[in-house]
């Protein structure tokens, strides 16, 4: 299928193809060709065949630069696609959701995780296996999920944060992530340890205030942050609340101790950690504090975050829905 602003994408038709009586649904695959060590491109023909068999007339767009997936997703909304599939990491998913979030009528969203960390996919149990991820889209169920909006014009699907440590994910070059995967983050983290410092911040959350020095703050929508799934263990993807985690000022020995607790999910009762849930959060500082938005550079404070409850309809595994229902 070809179209304005579309990359060529061979669509495979069944025997009765375009003459079938039931109209086909329309899907748009938006993929980052550099994610996942460029594996997705090689699997594209079989993905298209699966989508066709499931009743989707499918077109593709390979992103070429930052912000490209936003425009591709906007195109999908304006041309009334039924489904948009994000293929890439958390940054690609963020751009796809950002492209559709402002519209009153939005297509459903599917995800094929091909990034380095894939926090959202981890949170809802979408596997990295391409064929299994496609099966979730065509055989699974969609549920409404929360997203966040920052300063009324930028969106987050998984995490926002500030502090030197949160700069790690967007300081690692894309080529290094392609070659080394998650190891690239560990190496960069070790390199950054000597430069970790606190900043004075004022954080207002649902009528409460934190006004003190902090090493970092994290505003989350899921339980997975940087690949660690125990930082916000009770996070829910559709309860209308962010999790807010503030790591207060501490020395390096204390930092290492709290970090080891966090790996085991035992950090929430530590006096150096403030952990709450809130639907609206405002953060200001007299210092220059950089922001991380779903693993990418998100600007500089001040910032206000608002939870848009159940705003996006996403396909997730049936097992995740059953697990969620049991809680």
Where are these regions (language model features)?
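Glycine-rich phosphate/pyrophosphate-binding beta-alpha loops
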Residues: 161, 165, 218-231, 297
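Gly/Ser/Thr-rich active-site loops/lids in small-molecule metabolic enzymes
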Residues: 176-184, 233-253
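Short Gly/Thr/Asp-enriched flexible loops that form oxyanion-binding sites at enzyme active sites
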Residues: 91-104
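ATP/nucleoside-binding phosphotransfer catalytic cores, i.e., glycine-rich phosphate-binding loops
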Residues: 205, 211, 236, 246-327
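Glycine-rich beta-strand-to-loop/alpha-helix junction loops that act as flexible
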Residues: 33, 87-89, 112-114
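ATP/NTP phosphate-donor binding region
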Residues: 2, 6-84, 208, 321, ...
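Catalytic core of DAGKc-family lipid kinases
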Residues: 54, 63, 102-215
């Amino acid at each position: 299928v070809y179209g304005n602003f579309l990359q060529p994408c061979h669509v495979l038709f069944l025997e009765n193809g375009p003459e079938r009586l039931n109209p086909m649904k329309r899907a748009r695959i938006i993929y980052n060709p550099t994610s996942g060590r460029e594996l997705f491109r090689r699997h594209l023909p079989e993905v298209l065949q699966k989508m066709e068999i499931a009743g989707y007339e499918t077109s593709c767009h390979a992103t070429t630069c930052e912000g490209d997936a936003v425009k591709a997703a906007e195109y999908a909304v304006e041309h009334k696609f039924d489904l948009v599939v994000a293929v890439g990491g958390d940054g690609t998913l963020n751009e796809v959701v950002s492209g559709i979030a402002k519209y009153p009528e939005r297509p459903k969203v599917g995800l094929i995780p091909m990034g380095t960390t894939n926090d959202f996919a981890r949170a809802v149990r979408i596997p990295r296996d391409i064929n299994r991820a496609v099966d979730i889209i065509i055989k699974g169920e969609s549920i409404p999920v929360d997203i966040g909006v920052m300063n009324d014009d930028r969106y987050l699907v998984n995490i926002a944060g500030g502090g030197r440590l949160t700069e790690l994910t967007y300081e690692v070059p894309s080529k290094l992530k392609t070659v080394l995967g998650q190891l690239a983050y560990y190496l960069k983290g070790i390199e950054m340890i000597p430069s970790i410092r606190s900043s004075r911040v004022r954080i207002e959350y649902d009528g409460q205030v934190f006004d003190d020095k902090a090493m970092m703050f994290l505003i989350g929508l899921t339980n997975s942050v940087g690949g660690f799934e125990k930082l916000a263990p009770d996070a829910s993807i559709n309860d209308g609340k962010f999790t807010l985690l503030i790591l207060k000022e501490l020395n390096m020995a204390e930092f290492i101790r709290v970090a080891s607790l966090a790996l085991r999910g035992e950090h929430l009762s530590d006096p150096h950690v403030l952990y709450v849930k809130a639907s609206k959060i405002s953060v200001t500082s007299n210092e220059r504090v950089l922001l991380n938005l779903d693993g990418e550079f998100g600007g500089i404070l001040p910032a206000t975050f608002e939870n848009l409850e159940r705003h996006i309809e996403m396909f997730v595994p049936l097992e995740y829905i059953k697990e969620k229902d049991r809680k």
